[in-house]
UniProtKB/Swiss-Prot annotation:
Coiled coil: 17-96
GO molecular function, one term: ATP binding
One GO location term (cellular component): proteasome complex
Function: ATPase which is responsible for recognizing, binding, unfolding and translocation of pupylated proteins into the bacterial 20S proteasome core particle. May be essential for opening the gate of the 20S proteasome via an interaction with its C-terminus, thereby allowing substrate entry and access to the site of proteolysis. Thus, the C-termini of the proteasomal ATPase may function like a 'key in a lock' to induce gate opening and therefore regulate proteolysis.
The family this protein is said to belong to: Belongs to the AAA ATPase family.
Any GO BP: proteasomal protein catabolic process
Note on domains (UniProt): Consists of three main regions, an N-terminal coiled-coil domain that binds to protein Pup and functions as a docking station, an interdomain involved in ARC hexamerization, and a C-terminal ATPase domain of the AAA type.
Keyword terms of this UniProt record: ATP-binding, Chaperone, Coiled coil, Nucleotide-binding, Proteasome
Protein name: Proteasome-associated ATPase
Pathway connected to this protein: Protein degradation; proteasomal Pup-dependent pathway
Binding site for ATP: G296, C297, G298, K299, T300, L301
Length: 609
């Protein structure tokens, strides 16, 4: 082959790919390759192909070795060049001057922008790479050393928290209150402006992407130096009070409270469903309902069932699908409202009713349910270490009696110490209807048991065989037997002996302290015993003995926790309201090995409720 072809085969590098330091070595390789070519040509020309085959083979091997060395050297040189370029870029980057940041205030038609940076407002030019039309007010922008906008960032995510007092008429500014009640006017960043623009405005968000509009009292993230509010910050203690959708509890899920359910339906549902009749008879619907009675007897369940039933009835009246019925149930636990800071509890109450009115203005029923009402709306003047009730109670009264009114809003309170609630809340015109949720008697207990012991449960084969395989009869017999055991006035069921001021004594049994929650506990214990029995014996199914054992365990567990209250409550339970209780003695000797013990009614009663 020709010399040029052989040069290409040898892979001789071009001058442009080499550095001056390696030229000597490459030149030496070229001379050596040229000498080898001459020797090869001389050998072929002088002795012929057959005679010099061995020499030709050696020369070709030598040429291949040189070509490989040349290729490796080229790769090394390329790698070194790339490293040099990377180092040069790093040096250039480290040598760049620092960038500054600012908040965009406004844009102009000549592609200049107003930016707040370093504590001053400046008009700056933009880099050609920046599309000024895409910039948004309140956005963070990056500036080079010449104070030219070179990059658009996001909106600020840290800053001070201020409270929105009101939105100004232009919709782009707001009055906020900061630390130490300092008022200031700030601009709203474009996301907040778009949230609050009216429907139909070209920049307004659609209903799917629009968050709720700003309201007085909202917390805003504010940059006080730039004068911008960037986003609404939800407060945890306020967001815990958000409106809950329709509860999934119906009246059919509640047992043993038929009379009380009828009372509350008359008080709540009739005014909503038959407004015309109420107007015709000039009858004012009640503003509120108080559910009171011992704990664990279904007060909260009834309130949730009211919201569920009301939503479905309203949907029927309007001709809507009952499955899409809507009402709102605002569940407020009294202790959640308490706050150590002066005025915070009252602010929470105002927010609760403000949100309730907003939802009710759409024609949707709203139920505001205060659980543990006695914990916050106590009788004024009874506080030992705090007088918070002196301002909280008037705040609730002003919301109920306020000039704004409570259209489509019903207030339901629940308490097991109704005697501690301020009387002003309970007078007619406020919580008009008062319904006592009593402890279940034997008939009510059977109804409650039937909600938990259903025919779908697996029953033991032996128990089923006694009733010829009739599951309904077996379940009914189970319920009757367990209720009979629970309500029997036998020695095993004795709990307390009460002594009255006139010397009379009365024995109280566990049935006097029974509740729906206790019945549910009994059934749950029995189901757990049935599961353990399956694991131990392999025989599936619930037995009557599981239920009877659960009653014994439940009574024994309550032995050390007698649900004692003040003497007036004891008199209310026993039916002797005119007699004062002076002495209480426990009669149970279950899991505790000690004998009957006395309870000092003067000091150890109130904390058990």
């Amino acid at each position: 082959m020709g010399s040029s072809e052989r040069s290409e085969a040898f892979g001789t590098p071009r001058e442009s790919d080499m550095s001056s330091g390696d030229e000597a070595e490459l030149e030496e390789l070229r001379r050596e390759a040229a000498m080898l070519r001459e020797q090869l040509e001389h050998a072929v020309g002088s002795h012929g192909g057959a005679r010099s085959a061995r020499d030709v083979h050696q020369l070709e091997a030598r040429i291949d070795s040189l070509a490989a060395r040349n290729s490796k050297l080229m790769e090394t040189l390329k790698e070194a060049r790339q490293q040099l370029l990377a180092l040069r870029e790093e040096v250039d980057r480290l040598g760049q001057p620092p960038s500054g940041y600012g908040v965009l205030l406004a844009t102009h038609e000549d592609d200049t922008v107003d930016v707040f940076t370093s504590g001053r407002k400046m008009r700056l030019t933009c880099s050609p790479n920046i599309d000024v039309s895409l910039l948004r007010k309140g956005q963070t922008v990056r500036l080079n050393e010449a104070l030219t906008v070179v990059e658009a960032g996001t909106f600020e995510s840290v800053g001070e928290i201020s409270t929105l007092r009101e939105l100004l008429a232009d919709g782009h500014r707001a009055l906020v209150v900061g630390h130490a009640d300092e008022e200031r006017i700030v601009w709203l960043a474009e996301p907040l402006v778009a949230d609050n623009l009216p429907d139909g405005h070209p920049d307004a968000l659609n209903d799917d992407t629009r968050p709720r509009k700003l309201r007085p009292g909202d917390s805003l993230l504010v940059d006080t130096k730039a004068g911008y509010a960037f986003e609404r910050i939800p407060k945890a203690e306020v967001e815990d009070l958000v409106l809950e959708e329709v509860p999934d509890v119906s009246y059919e899920d509640i047992g043993g409270l038929t009379r009380q359910i009828e009372q509350i339906r008359d008080a709540v549902e009739l005014p909503f469903l038959h407004k015309e009749l109420y107007r015709e008879y000039a009858l004012r619907p009640p503003k509120g309902v108080l559910l009171y009675g011992p704990p664990g007897c279904g007060k909260t369940l009834i309130a949730k069932a009211v919201a569920n039933s009301l939503a479905k009835k309203m949907a029927e009246v309007r001709g809507d699908d009952a499955r899409e019925a809507k009402s709102y149930f605002l569940n407020i636990k009294g202790p959640e409202l308490l706050n150590k800071f002066v005025g915070e509890t009252e602010r929470h109450i105002r927010l609760i009713f403000q949100r309730a009115r907003e939802k009710a203005s759409e024609g949707t029923p709203v139920i505001v349910f205060f659980d543990e009402m006695d914990s916050i709306f106590r009788t004024r003047g009874t506080g030992v270490s705090s007088d918070v009730e002196t301002t909280v109670v008037p705040q609730l009264l002003s919301e109920i009696d306020g000039v704004e009114g409570l259209e489509n809003v019903i207030v339901i309170g629940a308490s097991n110490r109704e005697d501690m609630i301020d009387p002003a809340i309970l007078r007619p015109g406020r919580l008009d209807v008062k319904i006592k949720i009593e402890r279940p008697d034997a008939e009510a207990a059977q109804d409650i048991f039937s909600k938990y012991l259903t025919e779908e449960l697996p029953l033991h084969a032996d128990d089923l065989a006694e009733f010829g395989g009739d599951r309904t009869a077996c379940i009914k017999a189970m319920i009757e037997k367990v209720v009979e055991r629970m309500y029997a006035e036998i020695d095993d069921n004795r709990f307390l002996e009460v002594t009255y001021a006139n010397g009379d004594k009365e024995v109280m049994y566990f049935k006097d302290f029974n509740s729906g929650a206790m019945i549910q506990n009994v059934v749950d214990r029995a189901k757990k015993n049935a599961i353990k029995s399956v694991l131990e014996t392999g025989q599936p199914g619930l037995r009557i003995q599981h239920l009877l054992d659960s009653i014994v365990d439940e009574f024994a567990e309550n032995e050390d926790l007698p649900n004692t209250t003040n003497p007036d409550d004891w008199a209310r339970i026993s039916g002797k309201k005119g007699e004062r209780i002076v002495y209480i003695r426990t009669l149970v000797t279950g899991k505790s090995s000690s004998a009957s013990r006395a309870i000092d009614t003067e000091s150890n009663l109130g904390q058990y409720l």
